[in-house]
């Protein structure tokens, strides 16, 4: 399968990429490498993916519609795994527009890319912040 993986430089993204690559999938990873936390850590994760010939990285932002349109046009993806998100509740109160751009606009851009380019599978992980302060755990 050829998979577009957003948030590829994140902790979960890098591990998902490794699993997919080890099973033989082609992975195109995209990440904006923002400075919400140390970018050196993100770059180190990407270094771990470099040895895989079936991994390709794009430094880009899912909220940029034109970047995604170009990516979908050329990519011919079988699936999209969306792990890109601006996380952290406290920061969202200080910078709500960053959250809207990534978590809403970026998400919509991905859905539209899938719709217009016949991508049959879409996985969306969201973030732990959506669960709030629950006292009951499943």
What are these regions (language model features)?
Residues 1-138:
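N-terminal Rossmann-like NAD(P)+-binding domain of SDR-like oxidoreductases, especially those catalyzing
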């Amino acid at each position: 399968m050829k998979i577009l993986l957003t948030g590829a430089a994140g902790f979960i993204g890098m591990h998902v990429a490794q699993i997919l690559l080890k099973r033989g999938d082609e992975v195109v990873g995209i990440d904006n490498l923002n400075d919400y936390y140390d970018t050196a850590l993100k770059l180190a994760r990407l270094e771990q993916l470099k040895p895989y010939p079936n991994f390709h990285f794009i430094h880009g932002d899912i909220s940029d519609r034109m970047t995604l349109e170009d990516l979908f046009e050329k990519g011919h993806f079988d699936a999209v795994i969306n792990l890109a998100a601006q996380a952290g509740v406290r920061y969202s109160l200080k910078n709500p527009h960053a959250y809207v751009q990534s978590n809403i606009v970026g998400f919509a851009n991905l859905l539209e890319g899938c719709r217009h380019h016949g991508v049959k599978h879409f996985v969306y992980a969201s973030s732990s912040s959506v669960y709030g302060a629950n006292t009951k755990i499943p």
